[in-house]
Amino acid sequence: MKKIALVLIIFHLSLLTSLACTNFIVGKKASADGSVFVTYNADSYGSFMPLYHYPAAKHQPGEMRKITEWDTGKYLGKIAEAPETWNVIGNTNEWQLTIGETTFGGRHEMTDSTGIIDYGSLIYITLQRARTAREAIQVMTSLVEQYGYYSEGETFSIADPNEAWMLEMMGCGPNRTKSAERTVWVAVRIPDYAVAAHANQSRITRFLDGRYTPVKLKDLQKKYPVGGKKPVPNLVCYSDNVVKYARTMGWFSGKDAEFSYNAAYAAPDFSGRRYCEARVWSFFNRFADDFSKYVPYAAGIEKDAEPMPLWIIPNKKVSLQDLRDAMRDHYEGTPFALDKDGDIGGGIFQMPYRLSPLSYKHDGKEYFNERPISTFQTAWSFISQMRSWLPREIGGCFWFGNDDGNMVAYTPMYSCMTRLPKCFSGEGADDITFSMDNAFWVCNWVSNMVYPRYSMLFPSLKEVRDSLDQSYDRLQAQTEVRAQALEGDARVRFLTDYSCQKGDEMIDCWRQLAFHLIVKYNDCAVRPTDKQRRFERDQYGRGTRIKRPGMPEGYVKELLKLTGDRFLMPVEEKK
């Protein structure tokens, strides 16, 4: 989950786990139904990630909490526990507060190796302690000032049913004891009518040039309230030392109004633009009439190309399905598309993915692969839906998939639920233990059948995936009407049971899909099925004759350019 902007050698060493995550943010007036949305692809090779559940609890005075690094399990220290903590499902809590992240790395000397709070722990501790996005910003920044921030530079998506923010944070190096100098951070409120995104590259630039209305951290929950008489302006909140620290280190010498957070602390290089900002570009491109002016920036070739804005006003209202589609994106129909004529990088079956590492060398030259939003190494993917007009037990719907978003159906998990479906719990499985009852492993089993023979197998997966997505959409309204007729614990039990049932149904469906794929596509051939996906039998009761599709025409054309007449069939004279 890391993008380390260091020297080239360190960059290559980190490439397998770098350039890892993607987040999208949709304001309530930008969405089709008034929801606030946050999405998150958690991309990390080798990571096994279940759906997390932290039950609500009350804690004794003096109780301490052990902190272990989210990425590695390394013990970092202890912090004081809060008197009361909230129920957390995945990256959302019972108040519909949602937090996502992407790592941008930044200047390596800013990492605080003596800190106790890493970025993952910061997310889940905050979800247990905060109820709104603004409270979350206060909790997160106070925790790292008190205990130190152990991780590299992060961009956080922080949202509740009423508003969304983007927070960027970095440490100030090790052995800092004066709390006001332990981190540098800035938080920007995303306008209600806008969409935003981040993908492992710091995105906040100038914020003291008059475009934003500053608000002090202590006043964040009191001033410019949501739902007040006046519209909420474009707010910014930042640490007192955010500019001073850059001046002290010699990284900035201009006027405060000229200060850019990412220019000072995490300036985008080629990899930050082509691998990271290009994903943001692809998301924005879906909701803009013409976003081609920013192609040179996203491509990373032109050093002085105009950078993209932090957020845009979409040209249409954004729906849940729009976000599913965006999470499954491979740059289709864009200059970065992976399915262009002549590109055989996806193999015989035109896989819209490229093998890692992202760069490789040949004959003394270095080359690179595109890095799309949808990628092999996604451990889980979610779309968090937050709705202010519904009771909070119902309003928070956490659409969850335990693999690459392109290869899963997003299954509804309500944020009030008090237990998990077994398939998402991690029970009986880990990163090196396969289980037929575990969604991570069953979904990865299916996707890893599909990847190498994408154009052949993916249509079968897509049919099942889309059918499940559509069934969940059809059931959502009637399920929530039934939930509104209930109260208190009965409502929570109903939505818990519903969520667990959908999880159980999903994994059963995916197991059946796995069985179907191995039979239908065995030996790189295709067994015919009827419209109900049932295998056909001949008059003797055996499966009907298989079909051998051969190689796609586009691949044949490129192959023959390489092989010439080597495999040209000789013309034999007829006798």
Please provide the spans of the model-predicted regions.
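Accessory, solvent-exposed terminal regions and/or long lumenal/extracellular loops of proteins
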Residues: 273-275, 280-364, 371-373, 467, ...
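Second-shell loop/turn segments in exported
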Residues: 111-113, 121-130
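Substrate-recognition/cap regions that form aromatic- and gly/pro-loop-enriched pockets
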Residues: 344-485
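A contiguous strand-loop segment
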Residues: 21-119, 139-310, 317-318
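Sec/Tat signal peptide C-region and signal peptidase I cleavage site
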Residues: 16-20
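Bacterial N-terminal signal peptides
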Residues: 5-15
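Histidine-centered catalytic/metal-binding microenvironments
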Residues: 467-575
